[in-house]
Regions:
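Terminal accessory carbohydrate-recognition/targeting modules of carbohydrate-active enzymes
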Residues: 1-168
Length: 168
């Protein structure tokens, strides 16, 4: 089973309910520059990890071509999809809620993580986006580079912009 959210321009976010990119058209953020078929896979997937009291747990899910896999679904306690997809994970006394939304009429996606730490231990969340910036169905170009622009912090949230090959 998969979720699908759209932006009204032909862009979308669609992965399995566990957050894996299992099909060729899966992407966390697929932008559309010209409807209906000029789509670019901007962010393939997210790798998510929480460190609690010095021990790290990957709670993202993905199976790779070489047979290796991330089994974050083992920590997934709930997935719901009313207006937006929401995931809840429980890891050693820490609850993590993730919600993704797309802005209508724009090639923009936002994701929010809420970490409720019920332990007295230090917890640190790390998220690694797997950027592609490639046409839908195409591989990343050899030598492709990315440039990161920092934005100021807004209401306690970090923001920024990534650019590659004229796409941003």
């Amino acid at each position: 089973n998969c979720y699908l959210i759209t932006n009204g321009l032909g862009g979308y976010s669609s992965l399995t309910m566990t957050g894996a990119a299992a099909r060729g058209d899966h992407a966390f953020f697929m932008a559309c520059t010209e409807a209906p078929n000029h789509r670019y896979n901007m962010i393939q997937r997210l790798e998510e990890q929480i460190t609690v009291n010095g021990k790290s747990y990957i709670f993202s899910t993905q199976e790779y071509a070489d047979g290796s896999r991330q089994e974050g679904y083992r920590y997934l306690s709930e997935f719901s999809f009313e207006d937006t997809p929401v995931w809840r994970f429980h890891i050693n006394g820490v609850e993590i809620e993730k919600e993704a939304v797309m802005r209508q009429g724009e090639n923009t996606i936002a994701v929010c993580w809420r970490v409720m730490n019920r332990t007295r231990s230090y917890a640190c969340l790390a998220v690694t986006p797997y950027f592609r910036f490639a046409e839908k169905g195409q591989d990343i170009c050899a030598g492709q580079t990315y440039k990161r622009y920092e934005a100021e912090e807004c209401s306690g949230y970090s923001a920024g912009r990534i650019e590659s090959g004229g796409l941003s």
